[in-house]
C-alpha cells in the first residue's frame, strides 16, 4: 500500500502544482524554460504512475474489503465510464459543443471515471486510488473555473520579453 500512496503523492502532487502554486509554476517556467519544466514534470508523473500501478497491483493481492457494492452499481459504473470516455474525447476535439459548454471536459471525465470505480468497488485499494483521483479532479475543476473567471488562459504560458 505504501507504493500506491507514494505514487499517488507524486503523480497527483505534480498535477496539483497548477492548483496550489500557479504563480510559482509560472516563475519556474520563466526561469528554467518550458522544455526543462515539461521534462521534470513528465519524469515525476511517470515515476508516480509506475508506483501507482505497482502499488495497486500489490494491494489487490491482499484486499481489505470496506463495503460490498450492490449489483446495480456495476451498471451505473459502466454508464459513468462511458460518459468519462466521451468527455475525455471532447477535450481533444477542437471547437466542440461539449468543451464550449463544460470548459474542462477532461477533468470532468476524470471525475466521472473515478466516481464510477468508487461506486463499483469497495476495497481499500480502490477507494484510495479512485477517491484520490476524484478529490484531485474536484479541486482541479474548481481551480480551473476560478482561472477561467479571472481570464487566465490554460496551457499557454509564454514569458514576457
What spans do the regions from the language model cover?
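Membrane-anchoring alpha-helices and their flanking helix-loop junctions
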Residues: 1-103, 108-161
Amino acid at each position: 500500500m505504501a507504493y500506491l500512496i507514494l505514487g499517488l503523492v507524486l503523480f497527483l502532487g505534480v498535477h496539483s502544482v497548477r492548483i496550489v502554486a500557479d504563480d510559482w509554476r509560472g516563475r519556474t517556467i520563466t526561469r528554467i524554460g518550458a522544455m526543462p519544466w515539461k521534462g521534470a514534470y513528465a519524469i515525476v508523473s511517470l515515476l508516480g504512475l509506475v508506483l501507482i500501478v505497482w502499488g495497486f497491483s500489490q494491494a489487490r493481492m491482499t484486499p481489505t474489503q470496506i463495503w460490498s457494492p450492490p449489483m446495480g452499481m456495476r451498471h451505473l459504473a459502466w454508464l459513468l465510464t462511458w460518459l468519462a470516455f466521451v468527455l475525455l474525447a471532447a477535450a481533444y476535439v477542437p471547437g466542440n459543443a461539449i468543451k464550449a459548454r463544460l470548459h474542462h471536459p477532461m477533468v470532468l471525465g476524470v471525475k466521472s471515471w473515478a466516481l464510477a470505480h468508487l461506486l463499483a468497488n469497495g476495497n481499500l485499494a480502490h477507494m484510495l486510488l479512485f477517491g484520490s483521483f476524484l478529490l484531485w479532479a474536484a479541486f482541479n475543476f474548481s481551480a480551473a473555473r476560478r482561472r477561467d473567471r479571472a481570464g487566465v488562459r490554460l496551457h499557454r504560458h509564454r514569458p514576457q520579453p
